[in-house]
Every structure is written in C-alpha cells, then in structure tokens.
C-alpha cells in the first residue's frame, strides 16, 4: 500500500504539530510485525545483527515496563521493509518542508496490560549531535488504541512554544510522566490541550520534533504495540564534537 498526504493535512500539521491518519499498514503486515516483535524481544534477530539499543528482553526484564528496541530495522527484514518505505519518507519530507528524508532510528514498542508510562518529552531536545536540529516522526499503531490502553498523547500546538527543554529525569516509568511538559506549559502561561491518539490498528500519526508527547499506564486488558520511524532531513550534517553525547 502507498500513503499520500493531502494539502489540508499538511496545513493541519503546521497548526497542531501532529497529524492522526488511517491506513498506514495493512492487516498482513500487522500480523507479520506481531510475530517479529515477539521474536525480537526474545533475542531472535533475523539478520544476525543486534539492534543498537535493546531495553527489554524476555525473562531478564521488568514485565511491567514498556518494551523498547531501537533500530530493529538492522535486525529484522519486516521491520526494515516498513520503516524504510519510500512513501513514509516522502510524507515526512512534505510535512517538514525538507528536500528528502533519512532515517534516524526506529522504535519497536510493546506495552502489555499494566505497563507503566513513558515520560513526556520533545524529540528535538536530544539532537545536539546533528544540524539542522530537526526530526519528524511517524508512529504506526499495530493494535487498536484508546486512552485506557496508554496510547500516545500529544499537546496540541506545543511545537510553537518558546521554551526548549533539556532532557532530564527518567524516560521509562517516571514518577510523574507529565511533569516536564506541565512545567513547560506553566512557563508559557498556557493550559496544555492533551490529545490521545485513539485509532484502529494500521493507522497512526506524524509529529513535529518539538511537539510534547508521552504515554500513560496501560489500564486496559489489551496489548498496545507500535512501530515508530524517526526521520531527519536529507541534507543533515553531523556535529562531530557532540557525537558521543
């Protein structure tokens, strides 16, 4: 399948800092990714290459944490075929006004019932190691999502706030997962408008690198899995003195 943005969607993204869409992946791909997610979290890496970051493995990790693997595209052909899709890269470039898109990394995320939150953050805040300091993200829901399932949350218009927060504190299971965002909102003298991404599986969202986002506890009885593509503009250059940060 191929995904195309409309001009109205691009304009809405500029206003809100995020865009919720349907039909990013089909049912066959979802079923394949469910299987591959299980194997990745069991340490079964199809290509023989270990992902760059493995934050959770079966039998060795806290079962109540959200499972995360970064850059599974290096380890699994199905993940690679999804996050390296030309149409998704083109959509990111159109939303960012970029000449093209390069992948920064992917995230394989799996949130079982009862899993704890991921703290609110801004993706661009982590990017001192390249310039221009810009990232756009495509988040693909592999299960039906709801507020109760701990789905992704955005703060509407927060990409236009003046403050840019330095990352601090725990990302996985912080004591108050909204704290950094609410502090930023207070500095802006604004009441944050939080939007929960509630969408059938196969849909997803795009968001700006300065948009505040996070996710709460999965209070449902259902798993909440997602595949995430982070992209940077094609003319990005590295900042050598910051590559180890």
Task: Describe each region flagged by the PLM.
Residues 2-15, 22-120, 126-129, 242:
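Non-heme Fe(II)-dependent double-stranded beta-helix
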Residues 43-55, 60-61, 164-170, 201-206, ...:
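Non-heme Fe(II)/2-oxoglutarate
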Residues 98-99, 113, 128-129, 140-151, ...:
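Active-site region of the double-stranded beta-helix
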Residues 107, 122-124, 140-144, 156:
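Short, structured patches in soluble enzyme cores that scaffold and shape functional sites
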Residues 116-122, 131, 148-154, 163-167, ...:
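A short secondary-structure junction signal
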Residues 123-135, 192-193, 199, 222-223:
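A short beta-loop-beta micro-motif enriched in histidine and acidic residues
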Residues 129-147, 198-199, 230-233:
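Short, conserved beta-strand element in jelly-roll/cupin
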Residues 145-212, 236:
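Double-stranded beta-helix
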């Amino acid at each position: 399948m191929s995904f195309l943005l409309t001009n109205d969607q691009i304009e809405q993204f500029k206003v809100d800092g995020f865009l919720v869409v349907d039909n990013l992946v089909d049912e066959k791909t979802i079923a394949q990714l469910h299987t591959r997610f299980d194997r990745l979290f069991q340490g079964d890496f199809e290509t023989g290459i270990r992902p760059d970051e493995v934050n959770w493995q079966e039998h060795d990790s806290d079962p109540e944490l959200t499972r995360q693997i970064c850059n599974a595209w290096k380890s699994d052909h199905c993940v690679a075929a999804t996050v390296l899709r030309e149409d998704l890269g083109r959509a990111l470039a159109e939303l960012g006004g970029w000449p093209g898109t390069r992948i920064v990394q992917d995230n394989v995320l799996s949130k079982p019932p009862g899993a704890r939150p991921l703290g609110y953050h801004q993706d661009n805040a982590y990017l001192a190691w390249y310039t221009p300091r810009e990232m756009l993200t495509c988040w693909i829901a592999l299960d039906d999502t709801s507020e109760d399932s701990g789905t992704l949350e955005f703060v509407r218009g927060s990409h236009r706030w003046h403050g840019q927060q330095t990352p601090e504190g725990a990302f996985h299971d912080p004591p108050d997962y909204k704290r950094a965002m609410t502090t930023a909102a207070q500095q802006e003298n604004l009441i944050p408008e939080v939007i929960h991404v509630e969408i059938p599986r196969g849909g997803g969202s795009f968001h700006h690198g300065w948009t505040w986002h996070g996710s709460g506890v999965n209070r449902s009885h259902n798993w909440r899995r997602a595949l995430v593509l982070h992209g940077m503009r094609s003319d990005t250059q590295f900042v050598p003195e910051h590559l180890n940060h």
